[in-house]
């Protein structure tokens, strides 16, 4: 490719003129297309109305109109007023009727539209003002000043204000793509020698000919239909950037054009996308590549795909579960079972993950000379890979490929020595062909079933367990192994529950002294390093949760409670730490019992189970609408969760200025990072009004790593009573927003 010479001033002027003319043409074309589309819709709708009207007229002609007989006025009610009703249609006589007045109906309180939610919904910050808020028919001077300040908070960006004026234009993707394609034709003509930009007026006069323009339009359409187009010249992007500087520099525009053209290609795969494993183009890839979409889209905290509460998903836990793995059947499953091979049974039993008794240390295999077979070395690889520490829970991943896909930082790996006493596995007699899909599926299944080749063969459905075993032996020769330090962690020491309860009290007292500093929890991930002062959990005074990547015996990890009661007093470490009992950690209090929620002994798991009360919505005696409870509740009993949009503190400041102007706000501080806004989305508890003598109270509780707002009964509440809680207004705001205080009833 030849290096282009620096553009001259005439060339730059030429391209700027082309950018302006083509942009104005596209702008006019877009307007024309919009007008034509509106006209077509109007004609279609008018035709439908005409058709419906004609059908109704035909039906009315078939009906016989019968005049109503006039009613005689009742003379027995002289105190009632009479009125005469006259009809404009012929054949109907005037009628005298008694006038009856209707009683005044109380107006329904104003309610703005909102969407119901049952849990929080995280949204992105709105950097562009969606609409100018309506401040009433009479616009005051302070309203104009407020709107100007509001627009300045969004850096002057208002939705729909992209004016089509060069110099202050934000070009849309569709217009930008068409503009570059339209300008690319002039670059092709320059290369062919049909157009010289230095030719001045003579060349401009030729461009204005309609025949030439039509020919150029056909050329553009032909370029669009061609399968492979030449990438536009850099001068085109430079000219567009000079005319529309708000759209970025030439390099940004070039990258933008490349992304838009790749998106328009239907055959192009997205980045890091593996071909369909069931399709004809399936490839043989490693386990982490096959499960890439699963690890990316699946939230391990909510157990949902495309979670809307954790946009930054935590890395999957690299430790094995503590339950028993699937055992290998001691007897062969058939004539083609791998257990019939010489040395296969010893190989499988040696490599099968085995449970260990409490306090029993892992035994290391003796290192032998390098003359051992490769099969033996691979077998030792599988042994280390399959071992797990049941007592400590500090197990390595199910396979090395899974571990690499789950860890953010790659672990150091080295070869493994072979065991001294291991039989050589019989080599396959006939080569068996494996497709890419089968090889990929084997690597995925092996991370879960390990050396249970009979189960893997049944899942594959196309290979016998003997063939699966032979392929596993072949695969183990190239698998890398984790280091001995990661495979053989130190034995876990039992933590004394009383010492841990005292530690929780000390941490909680520290938080109570600085109660405003409550930060959002993010799982820590610092491999090969304990949780110290640099750990994000310790820096934010949060406990390490089960989602953290630190060691299970971390001193900052919350172990749960060992209560045998209802967990509703400060004797429970979970209740003391203002968090709900975790069903994965608290195994004795009843939080882990999922079958019958109504008979669970633990009373500290209501939010995560959604055990809310039945609430009613009705006009309030204080202001607007109010929330009423249908059933009676006891003191400190959970009523409902305050749900809404989860927004940042900066977004809450921008929205709060508009809400203060309307004198209606549903913002609720969650922690130092996020705020719950129930204005657009929420549940019925959003209508609970403020009171200095409330019957409810709000509490921010840590529930499975997430801060959530629970509304609890401050005293015993009777059925049908309206709910109030303290908004914690300042003295000035309380006088400004709360004009009526409810009458306190004595129960």
From Swiss-Prot:
Q: Which UniProt keywords apply?
A: Chromatin regulator, Isopeptide bond, Methyltransferase, Nucleus, Repressor, S-adenosyl-L-methionine, Transcription, Transcription regulation, Transferase, Ubl conjugation
Give a single Pfam family match: SET
Q: Where is this cross-link: Glycyl lysine isopeptide (Lys-Gly) (interchain with G-Cter in SUMO2)?
A: 327
CDD domains in UniProt = SANT, SET_EZH1
Which InterPro entries is this protein grouped with?
CXC_dom (IPR026489), EZH1/2-like (IPR045318), EZH1/2_MCSS (IPR048358), EZH1/EZH2 (IPR021654), EZH1_SET (IPR044438), PRC2_HTH_1 (IPR041343), Pre-SET_CXC (IPR041355), SANT/Myb (IPR001005)
Compositional bias of kind Polar residues: 395-414
Q: Where is the CXC domain?
A: 504-606
Q: Where is the composition biased (Basic and acidic residues)?
A: 194-211, 382-393
BP terms from Gene Ontology: chromatin remodeling; facultative heterochromatin formation; hepatocyte homeostasis; heterochromatin formation; liver regeneration; methylation; negative regulation of transcription by RNA polymerase II; response to tetrachloromethane
Q: Where is this region: Disordered?
A: 188-231, 368-414
Instruction: Using the UniProt record, name the top-level EC class of this enzyme in a single word.
Output: transferase
Q: Which reaction does it catalyse?
A: L-lysyl(27)-[histone H3] + 3 S-adenosyl-L-methionine = N(6),N(6),N(6)-trimethyl-L-lysyl(27)-[histone H3] + 3 S-adenosyl-L-homocysteine + 3 H(+)
* Gene Ontology terms for molecular function: histone H3K27 methyltransferase activity; histone H3K27 trimethyltransferase activity; transcription corepressor activity
| Subcellular location per the Swiss-Prot or TrEMBL entry | Nucleus
Entry GO CC: chromosome, telomeric region; ESC/E(Z) complex; heterochromatin; nucleus
Segments carrying motif Nuclear localization signal: 491-496
Q: What is its main location?
A: nucleus
Q: Where is the SET domain?
A: 613-728
The annotated regions of Low complexity compositional bias extend over: 369-381
EC number(s) on file? 2.1.1.356
Q: Which family does it belong to?
A: Belongs to the class V-like SAM-binding methyltransferase superfamily. Histone-lysine methyltransferase family. EZ subfamily.
Described purpose of this protein according to its UniProt entry: Polycomb group (PcG) protein. Catalytic subunit of the PRC2/EED-EZH1 complex, which methylates 'Lys-27' of histone H3, leading to transcriptional repression of the affected target gene. Able to mono-, di- and trimethylate 'Lys-27' of histone H3 to form H3K27me1, H3K27me2 and H3K27me3, respectively. Required for embryonic stem cell derivation and self-renewal, suggesting that it is involved in safeguarding embryonic stem cell identity.
Q: How does it assemble?
A: Component of the PRC2/EED-EZH1 complex, which includes EED, EZH1, SUZ12, RBBP4 and AEBP2. The PRC2/EED-EZH1 is less abundant than the PRC2/EED-EZH2 complex, has weak methyltransferase activity and compacts chromatin in the absence of the methyltransferase cofactor S-adenosyl-L-methionine (SAM). Interacts with EZHIP; the interaction blocks EZH1 methyltransferase activity.
Protein name listed in UniProt: Histone-lysine N-methyltransferase EZH1
Q: Tell me the name of the encoding gene.
A: Ezh1
